[in-house]
Structures are given as structure tokens and as C-alpha cells.
């Protein structure tokens, strides 16, 4: 029996002893609570994003006449998978950290950013050993989602996403294997870029699954996103104007319950007033993949019916996860076998499943992957950009148990993320505001090696996307939104075809049907106005343009067409005002310049 216990027992009836014990216990409780509050305060200060705070200063700028460092004055954070000299890379796992030495060199990508003038301010929390897309870490805590504090931030690069979303840094680095940059970017309402697989150096980055993963980055500002991309990919600053062909993945947007007027229609409207964009196309990605990736049939669920889009993408994502488990086990099984006796049981289910997986059908897995890259290349060619939802669901609540609902969430999320992971193509996540209290995002995906093309497109379309997203947020919901949106777009496309064929009356009829299905689309009114102008129905054209402006005040075409209608009605002063307004919105518009100059003679 200990001396302390003997003393207590022998003086159990002495009230002074109990006072001492009470004070001692109270002191311990107070100290514990003080420590909790201190930890809580530190987490609130940086949203729980950082694991280690330090400062890596940029390299000295080169002497003139060398160009200025492109990232000068910017700060960034890095996930716990990147080596920093004299620091142990923990891989989001204390057991890993205990069994490894400090890095001898800093990761190449980090050094590249320092050479370009940026300052690294610390390492951020990530999902354990790079697994998962939820963003929770049972060892270090879960970073706080700046947009939805009661919900997960997304992973595996959770801390890096939060550090940008909370405006703690200008940009950050993360790892994207099965969605580790794209998903948290969507959940935190920021930009996230996954480059073409293998195009950014992985030297000094701990591998999870090397044939799937790539270094990715986050930013809130599209210009910063592009500057980082130019530095890491060593891209030319010269921009060649190219045509772009957007292809909407209709079946993938059906996975999401976000109204299409806040996703698909936002993208459509954003490119209508931009030059260099072809008429959008549509594709059923699931059917396209099923038809062009024959090796995938081996992994599809057996049924008497033909495979639908959802089952095809589930099969594709299952192949992706099987490759991830196989490569992770190959990379780290030796460490596990050597150290498991003293590592303890606290590993995530994903890690344990990977380490216990059996390597079956490996050749078939990689055959699917190779066919998938060729399939997406064939679909997109050299100017195609696939438009898909980044995620189908809002971020789950914190500490959600692994149940049927969460498994379905994971299935839908992986069905979307596997397209880029399995093809190796580049993908950017772009925020589009909010629906209710949840963030909305859309992803643009282009062919392997088209990183500069995608970065330039992001910079070109971003401002217009944000304008249209704000307009969409103020519109009243359209009943039966998804169905009516699709039908109205079909009518609009028929109207466009009739217009090109100079069948003006048919065009008017088709546009009228589109308006009946969706009266909140400015383009439908504006297009019908163009057809009315060809029919010399100037008053109807004027009315349609006015309606279009009430929906979209920045619709340049509406001002141009109303100006033309008013000029034809000999209302020169009003017509001139419309053309001047068009020039305010688009100063280099030649049609408006010529018309405004012409009308001066009549006023």
C-alpha cells in the first residue's frame, strides 16, 4: 500500500485532510480546464489547421535585369506529407512520426515556391497517411471548416484547405489521390487545382498511391492559383487565344440535388458573353465510359439489365480504390510489419483495409486505368473541357459514424473524383456561392497535359462565373427545376438551329417554348429578340430585351439588340443610350462604337 493511501486511510475522519484533498483535486481540474481552454484558443486562432508553425523565408531575388519573383509577398502552408529539412514529416500520423527521422532535404515543390518569392509559414493537418476525403484526424483533431464549422472540411488535405479558406495564407499545397484537393476545396468554398498526374515533382513528398496521386494547390484568388501553377509546372507566360468547347456531363449533375439554375445554368450564362467559346455540348459520361473502357466490365455489378451510368462510375471508383490500396501496401507494408508490435491499434479503417488487402487482378486494374486515359483524351481532344459537379452532397456533420448514409456519400463523391484520378487529367474546382447554407462548386476537367489551357480558362471565366452565381442566388426557385431546365435548353438549342437556318418564325416559336419552361433565363428573351429583329418586329424585340435586362443587367447583347430595335423605330436618343451602356459594359465592342457614332448625326 502506498504511503499516500495509508495517510489518507489513517486520517479519514480528519476534515482537514479532506479539505487538502478537495483543494488538490480542484487544482487538477482547474489546470486541466485551463489547458483545454488554451488548446481551444489556439485552435480558434488558426481554425485548427496547423500542425507546426515555422517560417521558411524566400530565396533572395535575382539581380536586374532578371524578372521579379512571381510569388513575392505571398505566404503558403503545406500538408504534413511534404519534407522540410530538419523537420520530421508526420504523414498525419503520430506513429509514423515516432518511427522516422527528420528530413535531410526540403521537397522540390516547396523549394520551387521559395525560389519564386513565397514564404512558407507551417505544416497543416491531413488525413492519416493520406487516406480519406472526409478531413477528420483522430490524432490531431479536425480543422474547422470556415464556411460550415459543424461540418467536416474535406480531406485528405484538410488543414491546407482550411488555411486558405480562413484567409490565414494566400495559397497552400496538398495531396490529391482520390479527391484530396478537389473535395476540401468544394467544402471550404475555395479554388483547388489537381494538375495532370506526374507533371509536378513528387521528390520529397511521402507517397500514398503514386500512380493516382499528385501535388495540388488551393487559393482564393484565381490569379494566385495561376501564378502558383506557372511556378510549379514551369509554364510559359505567353498566352495563345484558343477556342474552348465546354461539354456538360448531364448524368453527373443528376447525382446532385443542387438546382441546375445555380450550377449548370451559371456556367452556361457565364460563357455566353465571353468570346472564344463554342456552343456547349452534352455527354452521358457513364455511358461513354462503359462504351469505351471494355476492361471495366469485369468490375461492374452483374445484372440482367445493361449497366447504367451510376453503376459504371461505381465500378470505376472501386478500381481506383483497389489501386490505391495495392500501391499503399506496396509502399508501406514493410514499415507496418516492422513496427506494428508497438504502434498500437489506433489506425483508421482505410489504412487497415489497405494493409490487409490481397493483390488480385492487378493487371486488370491498370488496364482499366490506361483505357480510361485514352477515353477521356478521345472525348476532350485539344479544346474540350468537361463540366461536372465537384461533389454531389454537402459536407457531412462532424463525427458522423460510418453508416449506410455516409457510405452512400462516399460512393457518390468517389464516382465524381475517379474521373480525373483514373485518367490522370487535370481538374479545377471553382466555387459558385451557396445554396442555403452549403457551398456550391463546379469542376472543369480537361485533357492530360492541358494544365495551362485549364488555368487560362479558369482565369478567363472566373469573374463571369461569380457574377452569374450572384444573380442565380437572387432568383426565385424554378418549380421542377432540373426537368424544366433540361427541356428549356433543348428548346433553346432548337431555336438556335432554326435561327442559323434563317427560319425566323420557327426560331421564335422554339424560344417561346423555352421561356414557358423557364422564364428566368435572360438568354431566351435575348435570342427571341434577335429573331424578332430579323422579322422586323421591332416592338416585340424591344420588349424581350427589356425583360432580359431585368434578369441580367450586364447582358451586353440585350442592350445592343434593344438599341437596334429603337433605332429602327426612329427613337434615336434612346437607341444611343443603349449603345453607350453596352460600351460601359464592354468598352471595345465594335458594333456599339459604330452605332453610337452613327446615331450622333440624328440627335
Curated annotation (Swiss-Prot):
It is found in: Mitochondrion outer membrane. InterPro entries: Amidase_dom, AS_sf, TPR-like_helical_dom_sf, TPR_rpt. The modification N-acetylserine is found at residue 2. It is a single-pass membrane protein. It comes from the Eukaryota. GO terms for biological process: protein import into mitochondrial matrix; protein targeting to mitochondrion. GO terms for cellular component: mitochondrial outer membrane; mitochondrion. Expressed in roots and flower buds. Detected in leaves. Chaperone receptor mediating Hsp90-dependent protein targeting to mitochondria. PANTHER family: AMIDASE 1 (PTHR46310), OUTER ENVELOPE PROTEIN 64, MITOCHONDRIAL (PTHR46310:SF4). This is Outer envelope protein 64, mitochondrial. It comes from Arabidopsis thaliana. The lineage of its organism: Eukaryota, Viridiplantae, Streptophyta, Embryophyta, Tracheophyta.
Amino acid at each position: 500500500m502506498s504511503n499516500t493511501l495509508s495517510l489518507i486511510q489513517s486520517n479519514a475522519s480528519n476534515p482537514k485532510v479532506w479539505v487538502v484533498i478537495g483543494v488538490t483535486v480542484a487544482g487538477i481540474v482547474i489546470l486541466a480546464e485551463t489547458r483545454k481552454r488554451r488548446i481551444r484558443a489556439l485552435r480558434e486562432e488558426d481554425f485548427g489547421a496547423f500542425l507546426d508553425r515555422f517560417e521558411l523565408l524566400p530565396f533572395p531575388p535575382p539581380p536586374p535585369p532578371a524578372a521579379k519573383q512571381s510569388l513575392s509577398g505571398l505566404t503558403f502552408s503545406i500538408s504534413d506529407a511534404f519534407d522540410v529539412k530538419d523537420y520530421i514529416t508526420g504523414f498525419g500520423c503520430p506513429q509514423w512520426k515516432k518511427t522516422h527521422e527528420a528530413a535531410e532535404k526540403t521537397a522540390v515543390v516547396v523549394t520551387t515556391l521559395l525560389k519564386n518569392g513565397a514564404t512558407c509559414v507551417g505544416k497543416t493537418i491531413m488525413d492519416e497517411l493520406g487516406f480519406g476525403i472526409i478531413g477528420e484526424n483522430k490524432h490531431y483533431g479536425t480543422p474547422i471548416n470556415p464556411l460550415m464549422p459543424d461540418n467536416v472540411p474535406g480531406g485528405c488535405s484538410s488543414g491546407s484547405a482550411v488555411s486558405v479558406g480562413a484567409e490565414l495564407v494566400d495559397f497552400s499545397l496538398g495531396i490529391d489521390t482520390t479527391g484530396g484537393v478537389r473535395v476540401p476545396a468544394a467544402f471550404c468554398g475555395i479554388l483547388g487545382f489537381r494538375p495532370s498526374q506526374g507533371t509536378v515533382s513528387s521528390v520529397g513528398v511521402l507517397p500514398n498511391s503514386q500512380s493516382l496521386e499528385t501535388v495540388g494547390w488551393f487559393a482564393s484568388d484565381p490569379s494566385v492559383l495561376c501564378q502558383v501553377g506557372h511556378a510549379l509546372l514551369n509554364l510559359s507566360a505567353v498566352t495563345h487565344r484558343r477556342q474552348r468547347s465546354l461539354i456538360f456531363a448531364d448524368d453527373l449533375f443528376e447525382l446532385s440535388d443542387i438546382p441546375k439554375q445555380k450550377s449548370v445554368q451559371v456556367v452556361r450564362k457565364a460563357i455566353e458573353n465571353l468570346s472564344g467559346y463554342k456552343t456547349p455540348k452534352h455527354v452521358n459520361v457513364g455511358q461513354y465510359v462503359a462504351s469505351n473502357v471494355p476492361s471495366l466490365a469485369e468490375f461492374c455489378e452483374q445484372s440482367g439489365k445493361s449497366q447504367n451510368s451510376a453503376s459504371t462510375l461505381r465500378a470505376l471508383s472501386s478500381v481506383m480504390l483497389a489501386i490505391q490500396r495495392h500501391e499503399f501496401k506496396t509502399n508501406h507494408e514493410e514499415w507496418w510489419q516492422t513496427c506494428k508490435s508497438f504502434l498500437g491499434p489506433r489506425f483508421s479503417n482505410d489504412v487497415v483495409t489497405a494493409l490487409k488487402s490481397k493483390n488480385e487482378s492487378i493487371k486488370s486494374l491498370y488496364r482499366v486505368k490506361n483505357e480510361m486515359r485514352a477515353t477521356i483524351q478521345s472525348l476532350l481532344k485539344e479544346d474540350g473541357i468537361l463540366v461536372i459537379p465537384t461533389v454531389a452532397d454537402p459536407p457531412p456533420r462532424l463525427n458522423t459514424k460510418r453508416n449506410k448514409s455516409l457510405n452512400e456519400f462516399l460512393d457518390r463523391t468517389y464516382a465524381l473524383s475517379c474521373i480525373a484520378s483514373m485518367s490522370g487529367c487535370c481538374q479545377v474546382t471553382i466555387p459558385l456561392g451557396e445554396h442555403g447554407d452549403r457551398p456550391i462548386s463546379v469542376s472543369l476537367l480537361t485533357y492530360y497535359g492541358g494544365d495551362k489551357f485549364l488555368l487560362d480558362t479558369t482565369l478567363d471565366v472566373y469573374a463571369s462565373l461569380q457574377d452569374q452565381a450572384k444573380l442565380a442566388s437572387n432568383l426565385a426557385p424554378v418549380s421542377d427545376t432540373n426537368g424544366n431546365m433540361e427541356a428549356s435548353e433543348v428548346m433553346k438549342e432548337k431555336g438556335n438551329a432554326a435561327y442559323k437556318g434563317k427560319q425566323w418564325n420557327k426560331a421564335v416559336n422554339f424560344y417561346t417554348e423555352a421561356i414557358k419552361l423557364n422564364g428566368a433565363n435572360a438568354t431566351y428573351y435575348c435570342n427571341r429578340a434577335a429573331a424578332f429583329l430579323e422579322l422586323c418586329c421591332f416592338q416585340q424585340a424591344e420588349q424581350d430585351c427589356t425583360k432580359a435586362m431585368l434578369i441580367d443587367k450586364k447582358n451586353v447583347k440585350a442592350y445592343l439588340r434593344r438599341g437596334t430595335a429603337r433605332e429602327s423605330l426612329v427613337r434615336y436618343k434612346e437607341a444611343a443610350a443603349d449603345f453607350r451602356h453596352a460600351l460601359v459594359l464592354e468598352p471595345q465592342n465594335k458594333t456599339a462604337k459604330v452605332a453610337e457614332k452613327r446615331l450622333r448625326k440624328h440627335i
